[in-house]
Swiss-Prot record:
Cellular compartment(s): Cell inner membrane
Membrane topology type: Peripheral membrane protein
Protein name: Elongation factor 4
Species: Helicobacter acinonychis (strain Sheeba)
GO cellular component annotations of the record: plasma membrane
Class of this enzyme: hydrolase
Amino acid sequence: MKPTTPTPMKNIRNFSIIAHIDHGKSTLADCLIAECNAISNREMTSQVMDTMDIEKERGITIKAQSVRLNYTLKGEDYVLNLIDTPGHVDFSYEVSRSLCSCEGALLVVDATQGVEAQTIANTYIALDNHLEILPVINKIDLPNANVLEVKQDIEDTIGIDCSSVNEVSAKAKIGIKDLLEKIITTIPAPSGDASAPLKALIYDSWFDNYLGALALVRIMDGNINTEQEILVMGTGKKHGVLGLYYPNPLKKIPTKSLECGEIGIVSLGLKSVTDIAVGDTLTDAKNPTSKPIEGFMPAKPFVFAGIYPIETDRFEDLREALLKLQLNDCALNFEPESSVALGFGFRVGFLGLLHMEVIKERLEREFSLNLIATAPTVVYEVHLTDNSIKYVQNPSELPPENHIACIKEPFVRATIITPSEFLGNLMQLLNNKRGIQEKMEYLNQSRVMLTYSLPSNEIVMDFYDKLKSCTKGYASFDYEPIENREANLVKLDVRVAGDIVDALSIIIDKNKAYEKGRALVEAMKELIPHQLFEVAIQASVGNKIIARETIKSVGKNVTAKCYGGDITRKRKLLEKQKEGKKRMKAIGKVELPQDVFLAILKID
């Protein structure tokens, strides 16, 4: 494709699509791409913006993607830069990042489901960024679509005027041309000073096998060309421009310059994305801007888990694989750790459980690793008796009980929208998870919005699955971190044959310790193979044993070769066996099979 000529700023529109998961966001993006002929019919596939196999299989967007579209309206040529964003709560940092570079957003709502929790959260991010919001009701061709009710829902819940809302069906390609016209007439053109020194915001970066680290930028002021020397303001380092490109899901389109207001890809020939961090500012090395762009928040890990290779000699392979994934995922961080039970591995920080699942699946699939993950935990604020504070993300790091003054755990504010028929089940689940009700609001006769504060620890295990199961999959959920609060927490250890299995230790609410301990030891009794000696499985809090099960020893018939004759001979052999078992019990170690850990992590 030939390099394209610069477009005047008044003819540029930068917009993103925000929606709850499954509301047809990626399908709508495909429609807009097809209508603008950005990709030929031969190359067009469904979910073309979702480039990872795992995205296509799960039907979700994980990585925000951008595409440059050309569209002609009333004889005038326009450039539309579309940024597709993820819909799942774990990837909301991708949403906030993408919205920094836009002037408008399409708020896509399913005509059969109405406004969901994640829709509200993403809309507030867009409003905070002063974006023009264009409501779009999708799936209007479905027999159970209720457009009037959904319009009212958007007005009541979010407060956006829906008198001239766009009604579309991405699948049936209804209303797409009208939507493109509305994007051009409603979303404002970018503002910026084309004559000022270059100021470009890096809002995404990734690693390319041929070009090295690439930065996706929005030109706020000035322009950039291939002859320039660029200063990365965060690192203070200068680099020459190797190439400039317009984004496209299938192939990058080369250009000689990126003008003010445009979105494009910059190649500086760097080896690592850490040299062009997301949120950093690029400027002209010879004529730099006075200060960088501010206010961009980097992503912080929310959930931590140990990840270990099942084949212990593949520790270095796991390190290499994590480093490669980190090149494209600035929210992923890790550090080495070791476990007596599992050997050497890494403590990895994730944005949430789906992020953890996706990373683990990519490590196993793309790097052929067999992995085991420990129970996910959050970061606890531990106040010690000497007035110091320690932050603990691994239960094995928790100091002894007599050194602890108090423990504070992180809380989140959860917003849940549910059909009212499931309200009783849902409130029971939230109470079991130590939730505190803050607000309950009926959106209409059949839907309720609940606001609860919940301990983060309670939502990182199985909350999402239980929420879906108690509401038959109809509830939607979103959360934001709020603060650390004091809690009555203890460390629950599991001992096998007297030894603590460190990989199974968890930090838990004191009132739930007995119930969890009992469930763990009962499950382990079924899972651990019988030994030649008796094995005690115990759950303990501090030095106090709160639950115990015993695996009986396997009997070996030592008198099998004695035929008749003197009973004292048999007795002597049985006594000798008893002595041997006593000695084995004292020094014997129980090897726990890997499937024991896998099964135990699934225990409620």
